[in-house]
Amino acid sequence: TMYDNPALAKSAVEALERDDVRRIVLVRPAVEAGERLGFLPGDLTQKVDPYLRPMYDALYEMLGYEKVARLIEHNIIEIAPLAFMRGRSLNESFVILDEAQNTTVEQMKMFLTRMGFGSRAVVTGDITQIDLPKHQISGLRHVLNILEGVEGVGATEFLSKDVVRHPMV
């Protein structure tokens, strides 16, 4: 599926403001599209920042830089690479897994089993834009087949005509 970053960020922020959740957790696999970035210097935030930039951009657009920085500082908004989710239990959280087409089956299972009480997960991705090695099955494609028809789980598929982009694209 494809989605609109600002609309999804808005849904997460609204859930937080209604006290439906206590925090927003943004997760993304660190998979490069084509070219290799190699070793990145810096701390964890600096290393994963390039992969999570689209999520930051959507939040900044909605809330402004200062408010987002304050919410991150207070751990109300957390931005985490998928690789560091193992062993966690995410309670009362609005959790967004972006670019899920680039998860393996094992990573998707690990992510979905992190959901705790009072949490909701939104998994987004585009199965036409998989950047995994050819022999690996996309976790998104796999989970769409497995969870079809399961109560409490829904999927929305957008077609190319639903995606609004500049005509030049």
Q: Which ranges hold each PLM region?
A:
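Conserved helicase motor core of SF1/SF2 NTP-dependent helicases
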Residues: 1-97, 101-168
